[in-house]
């Protein structure tokens, strides 16, 4: 998309799991659990998440996130997707902007100073589900692992970060 890096200098010939040591752009950030390889890259101080997926899935997720963003729903910002063909290997990747000041749900349990937010977890994710439903979206894999949270005036705001199973 316009206004974002082109990401052409990344080692796309390799799976994301092999990127450490292949690019200086990798950043370690606090993250949740993911069933797919995920890396974070830095371009001039802006962080981006890249998630490797089976062929075609990244395009579908990218399109769903664009639709959600157009409706101003709380989700990560889609930046682009990549279709990768290397030899017999076919895969894809989605690129999203890193959600600044966000926390994976596990952080709310691991850090004692965040304990007051634990009671707001269910309210936040329920609120997200209501917003998605009212906008006509179905989220087939709703879980805390597919959600990030931002603190908001003593409460939490939930953000969808994994749209693989949305319709």
Regions found by a protein language model. Name each.
Residues 138, 144-167:
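Catalytic activation segment of kinase domains across protein kinase-like and atypical kinase folds
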Residues 6-140, 156:
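Conserved ATP-binding subdomain of kinase catalytic cores across diverse folds
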């Amino acid at each position: 998309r316009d206004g974002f890096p082109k990401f052409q200098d990344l080692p796309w010939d390799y799976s994301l799991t092999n990127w450490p040591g292949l690019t200086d752009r990798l950043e370690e950030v606090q993250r949740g659990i993911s069933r797919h390889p995920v890396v974070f890259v830095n371009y001039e101080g802006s962080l981006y998440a890249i998630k490797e997926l089976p062929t075609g899935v990244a395009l579908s997720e990218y399109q769903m996130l664009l639709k959600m963003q157009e409706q101003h729903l709380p989700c990560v910002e889609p930046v682009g997707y990549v279709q990768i063909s290397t030899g017999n290997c076919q895969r894809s990747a989605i690129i999203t902007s890193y959600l600044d000041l966000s926390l994976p749900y596990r952080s709310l349990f691991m850090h004692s100073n965040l304990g007051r937010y634990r009671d707001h977890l269910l309210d936040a994710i329920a609120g997200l589900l209501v917003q998605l439903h009212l906008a006509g979206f179905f989220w087939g894999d709703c879980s805390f692992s597919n959600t990030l949270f931002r603190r908001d005036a003593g409460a939490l705001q939930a953000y969808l970060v994994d749209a693989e199973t949305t319709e």
